[in-house]
């Protein structure tokens, strides 16, 4: 929805908590059975981190996090899709209707960045130098084979992080991974990406590359920087969590195992 501010919510239309309306104001709203998810659903059919609702700055995207049981959007299997007012999301015994209020006429207009897009990042695997170019609006990084970038590393969660664009800037968010995502050696839940940043997912490292002449965090052409998000985008506050208990693309595997990489890098005869 262009211009203005709008507040999305999920309303439970089937399952425990029927009729409840849950505001989703975060850049990344997580739904799953793991503590820390904004919407905590306790049921065997719900994965620990099952669904991400992602705000790009102009659209809301729903992304199934490579789950075994899956998620349905308007009764069709979901991978990544834009959700609109009235969209229906189904996972386990729950059904949610997306409610997106029209822009508030009193609210200030969103800032418009008149500079060219910083472009899509390419990730360079620092072990193999292999390049990965995300092709989806939300790129999944993790251990599960259904991830866009699948990493064979026991320290990597099934889905560890998601890569997407927020206000046309490349960002990455940790999705409650057991080993924290690191950017340039620092644990981060959410970060804007810059040229030559090093992303650490478990013991696997990627260097961020942007097209030549492009910078990922320059001020907008109107002299106002594009809105910046903080780690609060994914940090869960106890009072902000909703706990509900039930009554009852393209895939680029990181081919070389880390052990093989370590052996290849050892000097001959060692």
Question: Where on the chain are the PLM-derived regions?
Answer:
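Regulatory inter-domain linker segments that are low-complexity and enriched
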Residues: 1-8, 94-159, 164-168, 190, ...
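Short polybasic amphipathic segments
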Residues: 8-13, 69-71, 119-125, 179-183
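A generic structural motif
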Residues: 11-15, 54, 124-126, 164, ...
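Forkhead-associated
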Residues: 22-91, 133-203
């Amino acid at each position: 929805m262009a211009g203005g501010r709008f507040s999305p919510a999920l309303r439970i239309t089937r399952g425990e908590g029927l009729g409840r309306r849950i505001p989703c104001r975060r850049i990344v709203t997580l739904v799953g059975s793991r503590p820390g998810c904004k919407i905590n659903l306790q049921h065997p059919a719900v994965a620990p981190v099952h669904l991400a609702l992602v705000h790009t700055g102009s659209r809301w995207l729903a992304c199934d996090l490579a789950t075994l049981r899956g998620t349905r959007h308007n009764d069709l299997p979901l991978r990544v899709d834009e959700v609109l007012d009235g969209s229906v999301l189904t996972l386990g015994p729950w059904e949610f209707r997306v409610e997106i209020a029209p822009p508030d006429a009193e609210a200030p207009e969103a800032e418009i960045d008149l500079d060219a897009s910083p472009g899509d990042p390419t990730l360079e695997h620092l072990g193999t130098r292999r390049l990965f170019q995300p092709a989806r609006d939300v790129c999944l990084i993790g251990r599960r084979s259904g991830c866009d970038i699948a990493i064979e590393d026991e320290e990597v969660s099934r889905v560890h992080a998601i890569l997407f664009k927020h206000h046309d800037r490349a960002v990455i968010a940790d999705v409650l991974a057991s080993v924290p995502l690191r950017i340039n050696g620092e644990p981060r839940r959410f970060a804007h990406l810059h040229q030559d940043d090093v992303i650490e997912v478990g013991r696997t490292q990627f260097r961020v590359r942007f097209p030549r002449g492009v910078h990922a965090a320059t001020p907008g052409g109107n002299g106002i920087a594009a809105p910046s998000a903080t780690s609060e985008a994914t940090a869960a506050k106890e009072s902000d969590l909703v706990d509900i208990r039930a009554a009852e693309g393209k895939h680029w595997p990181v081919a070389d195992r880390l052990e093989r990489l370590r052996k290849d890098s050892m000097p001959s005869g060692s």
